[in-house]
C-alpha cells in the first residue's frame, strides 16, 4: 500500500493503547508526540503537524467517548477524522463526456498518468482516448502509444508534427467519438514562460473541462509551492499525485496540496496501467490506519470478476460454487480473479481486520511468496487432465508424479495445491448452510474487527468511511 511507513508507524502508536480502560494526560502526550514524529518523517509541514497534534490532544482530553467505546477506539476515531481533514477533499470528476488536460514538469509521470486515467475511465463504462501533444521529449510519442495499447484505449499522436497545438486540434477531430479525451502536454525542468505559453495555447485550442496538475510524490511538502505556481499561471482544477510507492514523502505531498486551493483527483503507484485509484479521503485514511476500505474493495472485486468472465467459454458464475461441487477449475477462476484485483498486499489492506496491523506482522516477502505459489498452482493445473480438474480426489501418487513431470514442479507443491483446494471446499460447504442473516452477521463482525483487531462497536457504521462518514 502507498505510504506504508507512515501507516505502520501510526498503527503501532495506536496499538500501544490496547487494553487500557482510561487514558491519562501523559498517555495522550505520548501518543501525540509519536504521531508528530510519524508525520514529520513523511515530510508533512511542521506547522500542519503542530495544528493537527494540538487538535488531537484537545479533543482526546476534552471530549467524552460514547458509552462502550474503548479509549483506543475513541482516539483512533479522532486521529481518523483529523487526518481526513488534513488531506482535504477529492476533486469533483463526474462520469460524463469531458476533455481533461494534464500539465506538469519533466518526470512527474504525465504520460503514464494519462494511460492510467484512460484505463480507469474505461472501467466506468466510458470510451476514453489519449491525445499526445508532447513534441519536446524524445520517445514521448512511442511511450504514450505503447501505454495506450496496454490500457486498450484509443490514441492519437503525430511523431512527424512539431506544433503541439496542431496535434491537439487534429487529435480532437480524430477522437470525436470518445467520451473522455485526455490531452497530455510537454513538461519542463521548471515552470517557465515557454511552458506557460505552450500550455495556454493548447488550452485555448482544446477548451478542456478540467486541467489536472501531475505531481511526483517525492516532492513532499514542496508540492505546495508547485501547485500554487501552476494555479497562478494557468489555473488548475485538481492534482494527481504519482509514484506514491517509491517515496516516504507522500504524506507531505498530500497535505501540501490541501494547503492550496487545489484538491486531489487520483493517486498513482506502480508501473502498470491499473496502478491508479480515485482519491477518496475517508477510504484512504481508513486503510492507512488499518481499518480497511470496503467501498474500494467492492469496486475491485466487481471489476476483477468482469475481467475474469470476459471471453469465458464456460460462462463461469462464482455463485454456482455455493450450490454444487467445488472443482479445481473453480479454484483457478478464483485465482484469476484475485490476480485481476491487483497486488495482494493492496487487497489485504482493504479488508477490515486483515490489513494494517496483520500486514505489519508478516515478513516483507510474504505477499511475493503467496503470488509465486498461485503462479505455480496455475502451471500445475495446466498439466492435469479434465477428469483431475473436475475431481481432484482421483489424483494419487502415480498421477502426482506424472503431473510433476509435466509441470516441472515438485511433488510438495502439487500436494499443497490439493490441500488448498480441500480447505477451500470445506469452507464453501460452511457457506452453503448459511442463510442471509448468517452472512450479514459475519460481514458485520468483519467490519467491527477493523483497526488491526480492535473492535469498533458503538462507533457507528455504514457510509463511506469506517465511522459512517
Swiss-Prot record:
Entry comment, domain topic: Composed of three domains: the N-terminal N domain, which is responsible for interactions with the ribosome, the central G domain, which binds GTP, and the C-terminal M domain, which binds the RNA and the signal sequence of the RNC.
Assembly and oligomerization: Part of the signal recognition particle protein translocation system, which is composed of SRP and FtsY. Archaeal SRP consists of a 7S RNA molecule of 300 nucleotides and two protein subunits: SRP54 and SRP19.
A GO BP entry: SRP-dependent cotranslational protein targeting to membrane
Subcellular localization(s) per the UniProt record: Cytoplasm
Residue span of region Disordered: 388-410, 447-469
Gene: srp54
InterPro entries: P-loop_NTPase, Signal_recog_part_SRP54_M_sf, Signal_recog_particl_SRP54_hlx, Signal_recog_particle_SRP54_M, SRP/SRP_N, SRP54, SRP54_GTPase_dom, SRP54_N_sf
Reaction catalysed by this enzyme: GTP + H2O = GDP + phosphate + H(+)
UniProt binding sites for GTP: 104-111, 184-188, 242-245
Keywords of the record: Cytoplasm, GTP-binding, Hydrolase, Nucleotide-binding, Ribonucleoprotein, RNA-binding, Signal recognition particle
Protein name, as recorded: Signal recognition particle 54 kDa protein
